[in-house]
Amino acid sequence: MPDAVGAIDQGTTSTRFIVFDRRGTIRAQAQREHEQIFPRPGWVEHDPREIWRNTHAVMREGLARAGLVPGDLAAIGLTNQRETALLWDRRTGEPLHNALVWQDTRTDRTVAALARDGGRDRFRAVTGLPLASYFSASKLAWLLDHVEGARAKAEDGTALFGTIDSWLVWNLTGGPDGGLHVTDVTNASRTQLMSLATLDWDEAMLGVFRIPRAVLPEIVSSSAVLGETRDPFPGVPVGGILGDQQAALFGQTCFAPGEAKNTYGTGCFALMNTGPEPVASTAGLVTTVAYRLDGRPPAYALEGSIAITGALVQWLRDNLGLIGASSEIEGLARSVEDNGGVYVVPAFSGLYAPHWRDDARGLIIGLTRYANKGHIARACLEATAYQTREVLEAMERDSGCPLSELRCDGGMTVNDLLMQFQADILDRPTLRPKVSETTALGAAYAAGLATGFWKTLEDLRDNWAVDKRWHPHIAAEERRALFAGWGRAVERSFGWVEENA
C-alpha cells in the first residue's frame, strides 16, 4: 500500500522533489538550481528544457533517497512559480523561446498603453488583477508578436501556451505522445486572462491581448486526479496543481476565511483566505483563487506580492560579493546593532503591492561614512519585513479582519534575525511551522486528498504544529520611526524610469 506522496516544487531559482509521509513530514528531497538569464536590463528568462531536465533528475534522486519505488507513491503533486510564460511546439516538445519569468518587465510599455484607457484597474473586476507586466497575458502577447512563426502556430493549434505547471504536466504525462495540456485555477487566475466569476478563459480579455483560444490549456481543479506519469517513471497519479503561493496557503492549512500566511522566498507573498466569494481590493492587493477541490466551489484569496526579498540576498552575494553564501547574511547583519540609518528599497523591477509602481527602481539611501557592509546587510533583511507590513496593513483594510498572528514559511524563515524583526515591525507574533517547506507540502496535500491518501481537511490541520514563535519587543516609538524612514525611502524610488526610456 502506498505510504508517501511526492511533490514537485518548481521555483524561480531551483526545482525540488520532496517526499512526504502521512504526517506531512519530509522523508527525503533533492534539489537542482537552474540558470537565470538576463538578456537585457529588466529582461529575465529561464530555459524550459533545463527546468524539465532538472525536474526529471530530482524526481529520480528524491525517490531513491527516500528508499522508495514509484509504486510506493500514492500521488504526485506539483507547485510552481506563477505567471512565468512559455510557448512550445506540441509536435516536437521544443520551446519556441525561453520562458519569460514573472520578474520580467519587457512588456511595461504594452501595459502602460493599455492603462491609458481606463487606468490600471480597468480589468480588475473581471480578473481581480491590476494591469502589470508581472502577469502572464502581456508576456504571452510579446511571445506571439516577437517570436518568428509563433502566432501562426498558436492559431492552428501547433503551439501550446502554459505557465510552468502546464509545461511540466505535459512532459510528465507523455509530452508529444499524448501529454495533458492543462493548468489549474490558481495558475490560470494569475494570467490576467481568466474570469474569477466563471473560472474560464474570458473572451474579452483574449481579445484585448490578441490571444487565440486554441493555444490555451484546459483549466482544471487544484486537487483532482488528472492522469498518470509516464516520465521519468510510469503509473503514479498526478493529483494536484497549485501555484506556489496558493500551495503555501494550503500547506499552512489556512482553510477558513480570515486565515493568512506569508511566504519568504525569492519574492515575498502574503495570502488570506476570503472564502467562497471574491473580495475586491481597494488597497493595492490582488484578488485571486486560493484553491479548488474537485467537485467543490472554489475558495478565493487576497494576495500581496513583493518582487524582491530572497533575491536581494542573492544580489548581495552574486553582484556585490558582500557575502560568499546566502546563509552568511544573518551573521553579517548581526555584526551591527541596527541599520545605522540605512534603507535598501529593492525595486529592481518596480514595486508590487500595495504600490504597483513599474517606474520605481532600487536604491540604497541614508549612507554616511559611518555605514558599513553590516548596515547594508541588515537593511536588506529589514526591507523584507517593511514590505510585508505594508502588504498586511492593506490586507486588513480590504478584508476588515485584523490579523492576530502571522504564519510564516519559506527558505528565509531560518533567519532568526529577520523573523524577530518581522514581529517587531508588525507588533504581533510571527510563527514558523515545524515543516517550513509548506509550498511543497501544500502540493502534496492537494494530490493526497485527490487520491484518498488523506481523507479530509481536518486530517491536514492535525498535522500542523509550531516550531518557533517570535514576539515583538521594541518600543512603539522606535517602531514608528523605523517604518516612517522606510516610507521616505520608498517615495524616493518612484519615478526613476520614464515612460519613453
Swiss-Prot record:
S-adenosyl-L-methionine among keywords: no
One MF annotation (Gene Ontology) recorded for this entry: ATP binding
Residues reported in the UniProt entry to bind sn-glycerol 3-phosphate: T12, R82, E83, Y134, D244
Binding residues annotated for glycerol, in chain numbering: R82, E83, Y134, D244, Q245
Top-rank EC class of the record's enzyme: transferase
A Pfam family recorded for this sequence: FGGY_N
CDD domains recorded: ASKHA_NBD_FGGY_GK
InterPro entries named in the record: ATPase_NBD, Carb_kinase_FGGY, Carb_kinase_FGGY_CS, FGGY_C, FGGY_N, Glycerol_kin
Catalytic activity: glycerol + ATP = sn-glycerol 3-phosphate + ADP + H(+)
The keyword Cell wall biogenesis/degradation is annotated on this UniProt entry: no
Binding-site list for ADP: T12, R16, T266, G310, G411, N415
Any one Gene Ontology BP term: glycerol metabolic process
Top-level division of the source organism's lineage: Bacteria
Role: Key enzyme in the regulation of glycerol uptake and metabolism. Catalyzes the phosphorylation of glycerol to yield sn-glycerol 3-phosphate.
PANTHER family named in the record: GLYCEROL KINASE, SUGAR KINASE
Record's protein name: Glycerol kinase
Organism ancestry: Bacteria, Pseudomonadati, Pseudomonadota, Alphaproteobacteria, Hyphomicrobiales
